[in-house]
Amino acid sequence: MPFKIYKKYVMLLAFTAPALIFYAIFLLIPTISGMYYSFTDWNGLNPNYNFIGLGNFVESLKEDPDFLNSLWFTLKYVLVMIVLQNVLALVLAVLIESRTRSKGFFRTIFFMPNMISTIISAFMWTFVFSSVLPQIAEKTAIAFLGQSWLGDPKVSFFSIIIVSLWNGVGYMMIIYLASLQGVPQSLKEAAIIDGANAFQTLRSVTLPMITHAITICFFLTLNGAFKVYEVVYGLTGGGPGRSTQVITMNIYEEAFSNNFRYGYASAKSVILFAIVLIFTLIQLRVMKKREVEA
């Protein structure tokens, strides 16, 4: 091998090695270890453990109602977030893009909540739901605002959705805005000349041109919604009565609260990984197909 080519590969390895080492230590090795321990009864501390095969998986899917309830709640949360977050972000992006002078102001205002930590946002909204809204209801006689936003299982889900949207819509809006700026103005003008109204222009011209951004936003929303933890922990802690417990909270509880069943929690993590992988592959396949058609 010539010295120049050898030197080139050495330089590439020198620059990429630190990142690869950190990736292996903090992501690859823990992932492989978690998959291995999911087939054991390890408690996370004792070096002696037994290989139990698929026992943890069978127990979690057949004999653990708390896990199944948290899985169902998480799936419901994911579905609502995918729809609402992307629709709201796209609507805001279109409205802001249509403005000329105040575009920067509104872009900053709607993005600011994303700059606040999720757990801090949850604590802020806890105060709003438990103190501010009841006082407004008392002084204005609007009974709707005085309901138990965090204590009622039927209402607490919507409280979590509200805070999640408030915290995450701005980020998706920025992605859509960046994509909208790449849509040629001449195409919109041609559609208007042909008699298309604003909605028809959006549906037939704008949306096909930003399908790649929609794919990215759908993927980010799907990934983030399945991993949700802080907002639920800060608002309800999974209550009342575990009615708002998401799957990540159930896994954490199993690993560090319920007799330190680390192997059992690892099995649940593998199940979550498989579910996210399946949903992601389906979503990417559908969206990529639409990108090609567009």
Question: Where do the PLM segments sit?
Answer:
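A structural signal for multi-pass alpha-helical bundles of membrane permease subunits
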Residues: 4-294
